[in-house]
């Protein structure tokens, strides 16, 4: 595309303290969130005739860490396609050459709220269970491709008013390697698993601990382990769950084990004490959707020793979850990530920049050739035709699917923040 023609396709608009230079198909830009990794606007896409979210990555080439994170997020979003994962609709830059290349824009589905807002609502068991089911379906899809999200938290999980749920933000997601000691500083502190806090390395069910913390927060309407730092976070965990066994202690390196063993010992509380019936909604007409089953699921997710913690596959078979089980959603074909060295690769900033530029050009070429039409495929659709709609009844058949919206970036990631009001289906 020649320079003049490309320039005519874009226009610039100030959004807060930033300038967005976007394709003219995107109009009515309005800021909805910002954070360490990006600024997010809602916009109207005249080509698709729908509202979308546009995320401008903040200074993606300022250092190797930012550049690698931007590359990882873009590659994973391009290839992951599931109804419970946020759908990438477009990728573009206004710059015309690699030398000029500085800005990356990701266009995604626009959702109505993030889970931070939903947590404050009184949900019945149907909605609570169904939200968890969709969360686990999305995580299972990632895990099936060897991808651990590593940053699950309420602001990274978004919903639509029809109760469709989607998972956001792959800036910190990485491919898994059995036995690999992975980087300890990842997820927002409150949702960090013990193995992360203690620098033990981790595997896929590190995401299950985060889901357990989120479920507990939805039940209690407050953060389960609100630690101020690593040490306080660990103390918050053992004060409630109890000091772990000697078997677990022996898995720690010597210096960490010495510290942990010298802390006061706690017996912890039973899950009946931590999550009494009064915190839960009234039992559903469905005999599996009741406080005792939700509490049992919590007790299997919030296990300090990861080797004894439930897996995502096991969680999906739990009675509180499997009432929704649909093989098409749970067993969707895994994404094919062509770059198997996604995490092991190390490059200079300029090399990362060139790789990202090639990914953007590849997207543009596929769009031009009709391989991408700017619409999510059926598995990535925001609303699935024929999905059940929630009503005032508490019957198991009354809850619909869910969807997401960009959320504000946290202190460790590039998530987006929703600006919309509460879910009508959860009122």
Swiss-Prot record:
Residues 372-427 are annotated as: Disordered. GO terms for molecular function: ATP binding; MAP kinase activity; protein serine kinase activity; protein serine/threonine kinase activity. ATP binds at residues 33-38, 55. The TXY motif contains the threonine and tyrosine residues whose phosphorylation activates the MAP kinases. Keywords: ATP-binding, Biological rhythms, Kinase, Nucleotide-binding, Phosphoprotein, Serine/threonine-protein kinase, Transferase. A motif (TXY) lies at residues 183-185. Dually phosphorylated on Thr-183 and Tyr-185, which activates the enzyme. Residues 387-403 have a biased composition (Low complexity). Residues 26-321 form the Protein kinase domain. This is Mitogen-activated protein kinase 8A. Its EC number is 2.7.11.24. It comes from the Eukaryota. Pfam families: Pkinase. The modification Phosphothreonine is found at residue 183. The lineage of its organism: Eukaryota, Metazoa, Chordata, Craniata, Vertebrata.
